[in-house]
Swiss-Prot record:
Name recorded for this polypeptide: Small ribosomal subunit protein uS12
Family (UniProt): Belongs to the universal ribosomal protein uS12 family.
Localization: Cytoplasm, Cytosol; Cytoplasm; Rough endoplasmic reticulum
Residues that span the membrane, as ranges: none
Disordered, as annotated region: 1-21
Compositionally biased intervals (Basic residues): 1-19
Length: 143
């Protein structure tokens, strides 16, 4: 049996197309509402959080390294996430109980590269850009 052809088959075509859209990965992701349910950020691009601890995450094979990360508890909903701290020595600018701004890590909710289970990265510390601290253009505010 092929597809229905003829002058009064529009409803059948429309309904079939509506059903088949759900097989498309991107359509399903956009329309099922999992963006708000499953994503710790609740659909937002960034989120603020409090640093709980500094952690080292071992890189996946064949690489051998300890990637510097922090455990962050998000302010908006209390969820805990692991966020990567980019650049050499930037972990020294972050202390426990600091407020950090966390963003996605580039692969639309997936882990990046050889860092298993880490889907976020730190962008700001105490409302100062981590890049500015790294380049020594700005200093941490005195508390």
């Amino acid at each position: 049996m092929g597809k229905p052809r003829g002058i009064r088959t529009a409803r059948k075509h429309v309904n079939h197309r509506r059903e088949q859209r759900w097989a498309d990965k991107d359509y399903k992701k956009a329309h099922m509402g999992t963006r708000w349910k499953a994503n710790p950020f609740g659909g937002a691009s960034h989120a603020k959080g409090i640093v709980l601890e500094k952690v080292g995450v071992e890189a996946k094979q064949p690489n051998s390294a300890i990637r510097k990360c922090v455990r962050v508890q998000l302010i908006k909903n209390g969820k805990k996430v692991t966020a990567f701290v980019p650049r050499d020595g930037c972990l020294n600018h972050i202390e426990e109980n600091d407020e950090v701004l966390v963003a996605g890590f580039g692969r639309k909710g997936h882990a990046v590269g050889d860092i298993p289970g880490v889907r976020f990265k730190v962008v700001k510390v105490a409302n100062v850009s981590l890049l500015a601290l790294y380049k020594e253009k700005k200093e941490r505010p005195r508390s």
